[in-house]
């Protein structure tokens, strides 16, 4: 497949024109024109790039790419090495950030909800492109049971604050990655629990004082599944050779 055609298909699938982001979505570093082998991963780290080189990949597709708003534009140091490796090996780099978080089928929130048994997702914000969402568990569970479920699914213990929440959890809000700032909105919307990737000092106070269970399950861990699903969709729809590579990150 042509590299620009691949960008067009991905942009269309993820409706990138509908979402304001603080990083460019699409083809970020241009490589060879024809693509057959794609490596997908959460972040365009040097380790992922080196793996793609070893696999003779034509492209890398990630959730966390480059050129973030307010980022130093100079191509040097760690950033220079990464981009140089891509250019020397003629590898295309595609990045999709918020459009992949919010996609109703392939998105990080949607895939994590599916894995945790949370259904009927609705926007938490008053917007069709709300970043956080909420849904319901078919069978209510205790906070301890929900923490165990998260650990079983993500293969890591979540950081939890479950001191003053309700006895049973049914209504759950999700914002994968660094979404801890949405806890107040989740509490205001009557959610029993809020799950995200990261935690800040003030997050715990918000959880305690507003009576909502809080689970921080890892930025990387909560965002594996959207990019993996996007790659699987490409392989199924267009016959491309796509491999997901998980570069472990405890954060």
Annotate each predicted stretch with a short phrase.
Residues 1-251:
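Active-site catalytic microenvironments in core metabolic enzymes, especially phosphate/sugar-handling
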């Amino acid at each position: 497949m042509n590299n620009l055609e691949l960008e067009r298909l991905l942009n269309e699938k993820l409706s990138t024109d509908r979402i304001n982001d603080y990083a460019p979505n699409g083809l970020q570093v241009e490589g060879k024109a024809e693509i057959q082998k794609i490596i997908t991963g959460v972040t365009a780290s040097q380790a992922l790039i080196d793996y793609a080189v070893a696999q003779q990949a034509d492209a890398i597709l990630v959730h966390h790419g480059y050129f973030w708003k307010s980022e130093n534009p100079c191509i040097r140091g760690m950033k220079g090495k990464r981009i140089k490796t891509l250019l020397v090996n003629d590898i295309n780099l595609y990045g999709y950030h918020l459009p992949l978080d919010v996609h109703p089928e392939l998105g990080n929130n949607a895939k994590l909800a599916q894995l945790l048994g949370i259904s009927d997702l609705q926007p938490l914000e008053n917007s069709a492109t709300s970043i956080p969402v909420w849904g319901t568990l078919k069978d209510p569970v205790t906070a301890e049971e929900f923490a165990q479920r998260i650990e079983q699914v993500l293969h890591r213990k979540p950081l939890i604050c479950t001191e003053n929440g309700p006895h049973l959890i049914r209504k759950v809000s999700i914002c994968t990655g660094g979404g801890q700032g949405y806890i107040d909105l989740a509490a205001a919307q009557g959610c029993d629990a809020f799950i995200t990737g990261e935690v800040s000092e003030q997050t715990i106070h918000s959880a305690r004082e507003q009576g909502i269970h809080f689970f921080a399950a890892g930025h990387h861990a909560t965002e594996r599944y959207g990019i993996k699903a996007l790659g699987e969709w490409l392989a199924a729809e267009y016959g491309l050779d796509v491999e997901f590579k998980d570069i472990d990150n405890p954060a």
